[in-house]
Amino acid sequence: MAPEKSLERATFGAGCFWGVEEAFRRVPGVVETAVGFMGGTVENPTYPEVCTGRTGHAEVVQVTYDPGTVSYRALLDTFWDAHDPTTPNRQGPDIGTQYRSVIFVHTPEQEAEARASKEEMDQSGKFRRPIVTAIEPAGTFWRAEEYHQQYFAKRGGGQCRTVW
């Protein structure tokens, strides 16, 4: 594993975080994932609070990765492949603002790459509808309860829709 100082962080919201986390865990160069919440107004929200839709948070996966092994662009490709970025506030049967498609950027370089990648995906013809993914500055990451961490690895994936 690379020394910690050379690792970088990326944060993505793409629907139910259980399946999205598993998609990123499969990427070589990803050294750690954690699921949680970002983008809301309540400090240290719980899963039940976020599910009300009143906190403003999105379910997210925070990815720690070795940029010498995997590029941020490759992580963006995984993000686009893991969900339908054309549906606002919904992924499959999961409906609510917590399931929105969002890229939380940690650096100006990530923002530039995310915007370029979104434009390329929008122009690619892969999707019949426009991409609604938001690109926002990363805020505080609130780690979800432990039973949500690596949920698929612990329990299997029958409860969550993912596209991978």
Swiss-Prot record:
GO biological process terms, semicolon-separated: protein modification process
Reaction catalysis annotation: L-methionyl-[protein] + [thioredoxin]-disulfide + H2O = L-methionyl-(S)-S-oxide-[protein] + [thioredoxin]-dithiol; [thioredoxin]-disulfide + L-methionine + H2O = L-methionine (S)-S-oxide + [thioredoxin]-dithiol
Record: active site: C16
Enzyme Commission number(s) from the entry: 1.8.4.11
Bilayer-spanning residue ranges: none
Source taxon at top rank: Archaea
Molecular function in Gene Ontology: L-methionine:thioredoxin-disulfide S-oxidoreductase activity; peptide-methionine (S)-S-oxide reductase activity
This protein's UniProt keywords: Oxidoreductase
Role noted for this protein: Has an important function as a repair enzyme for proteins that have been inactivated by oxidation. Catalyzes the reversible oxidation-reduction of methionine sulfoxide in proteins to methionine.
Family statement drawn from the similarity comment of this UniProt entry: Belongs to the MsrA Met sulfoxide reductase family.
Name assigned to this protein: Peptide methionine sulfoxide reductase MsrA
